[in-house]
Regions:
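A short, mixed-charge helix-start or loop-turn motif at secondary-structure junctions
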Residues: 1-5, 52
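Short helix/strand-capping hinge loops at secondary-structure junctions
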Residues: 23-32, 52
Length: 66
């Protein structure tokens, strides 16, 4: 199986963060679920959890506070 490029990994992270921020803007942070983010990003739960274990980790990555 070929390795996934760093560019692909970064693009996928940005896709998930963008989807999360759209959900947060619509529903607020606490009411937004990881499933909402998965749906908005058009990805499976497994794909999203591969990059981020929680909503908090998405925010930390977006804010560069990890």
């Amino acid at each position: 199986m070929p390795k996934v490029s760093e560019q692909h990994l970064e693009a996928r992270k940005k896709q998930i963060v963008s989807a999360a921020f759209l959900c947060f803007a619509r529903k607020g942070f606490h009411p937004t679920t990881m499933q909402d983010i998965c749906t908005e990003a058009g990805l499976s739960a497994g794909a999203v959890y591969r990059y981020f274990p929680s909503k908090e980790s998405i925010i930390a990555t977006a804010c560069d506070v990890s």
